[in-house]
Amino acid sequence: ELRVYDAKRYGAAKEIVAGQICAIPNLNETFVGQGLGFLENDASSCMTPVLSYALNPNGCDLHACLVALKELEDEDEHLHVVWSKQLNELRVQLMGPIQLEVLQQILKDRYELDVSFEQGRTLYKETITQTIEGVGHFEPLRHYAEAHLIMEPGKPGSGLVFSSDCSLEELDKNWQNQILSCLKSKEHIGVLIGAPLTDVKITLATGRASIKHTVGGDFRQASGRAVRQGLMMLKERQGLKLLEPWYRFVLKVPEEKLGRAMNDIQQMSGTFSLDQATGTLSGLAPVSEMQSYAETVRTYTRGKGLLELSVDGYRQCHNEQEVVSNSSYDPLSDLENTPQSVFCAHGAGYTVDWSDVPKMAHEEYVLKG
C-alpha cells in the first residue's frame, strides 16, 4: 500500500512518480540507505560511528531510555544503540561530541529524558592478516553438524563477505544456505579485545550433516564455532590485527604556533604535510589521540586556531599492544562466542578445546599444511 498524506489525512495511490513523497506502512526491517525493489543498498550514505558513550540515566527509567534511543536509531544512520544485559549498561555509538549534544537535547525535548553521558571511548575493530581454515563441530546427543570455513584477509573497508565453494555432494544446498544465512545474521567479534570483526572474506569450503541427527540450529552452532576457532588459531600465529578509526585533519594556527602544532601531531602518532603558503597543516591522526584536540588548539592559540576533522576510515592501531593489554576480554570465557567444539562419545556430548579440533574433525581439511 502506498499512502499520500495531506496533513493527517491520506489516500491510497497505485503508483508514485519521481518527485512525489509517499509513505509505506508495516516496514519492520528497513534502514537508511536501503535500496527497495531493484535498487542496491547505498553504502556511501552510512558513515561508521567511531566513539562509544555510556548513558547515565540520572534517575530516568532505563527501559524508557532504550525505547527512545531505538526509535532515534531508526531515524539516524549515524546512531547505533547497544544494550549490554550482562553489564546492565546502555551505550550509544556516535561520530563525536557535537552529535552527542544534539542527541542529549532531543532526548530531553522530545521524550522528557534528562540524561547524561560518560566520556567517549574509541570503537576499535579487528581483522586478520593471514588465511586460515576454521572448523566448528557441534554434536551433542541427537545433534550433528560440522562446518569448515576458509577465512582470508579482505580489502580495507569491505566488511565481512560470505560465499560458498562447497560441493553439493558434500553438503546439500539447503544446509549451505542455512550456514550462509547464520553467518550473515551474526555479529562476529574478534578474539583480541572482543571488537567487531571486519574486512574478512569467509568461504564455506566443506561440511557434514547427518540425515538422522542434524536439526535446525545445529549449523548455526557449528559455523559460529568455526569462525572463532579460526581466529584463535590466527591469534596463536600472530595473524590478527587491531584497527582504529583515524581522522583526516586540516589545522591552521598562527605562524609562531606551528612548531607546537607539529610536535603535538607527532606525539599523537599522526602524519602531516605543511602548506608553506598558507601555514596550514593537513594529515592523518588516530581518533583516540585527536578527539579532544580542538579544545587544546583553542587554548594555546587563544581562539585563533582552526581544526577541521573528518573520519577517514580504519587503519592499523597505533598502540595495539597497549590496548590489548588494557582489555579484560577473554575469548575462552565468552560463552556466547565460544571457539570450542562439541563431539559425541558413548552417547554423550563432550567439549573439545579449539586447539584439538584439527585432529578431531570428521571432514578432511581443504587447506593442507
Question: How would you describe each model-predicted region?
Answer:
Residues L62-Q86, N174-G190:
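Phosphate-interacting basic helix/loop segments used at nucleotide- and nucleic-acid interfaces
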Residues E1-L51, E89:
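Conserved nucleotide-binding/hydrolysis modules and their immediate coupling elements
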Residues G207-W246, V250, E255, G259-A261:
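Glycine- and Gly-Pro-enriched alpha-helical subdomains that act as flexible
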Residues D275-G369:
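C-terminal accessory nucleic-acid interaction domains of nucleic acid-metabolism proteins
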Residues R142-K184:
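Glycine-rich, flexible beta-strand/loop modules in the N-terminal catalytic cores of phosphate-handling
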Residues F38-S44, L72-E77, L107-S116, R225, ...:
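A common structural junction motif
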Residues S84-Q99, T203-I211:
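Short glycine/threonine-rich beta-strand-turn micro-motifs
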Residues S45-G59, F162-S167, L243-V253:
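Short glycine-/aliphatic-rich beta-strand segments at the starts of folded cytosolic domains
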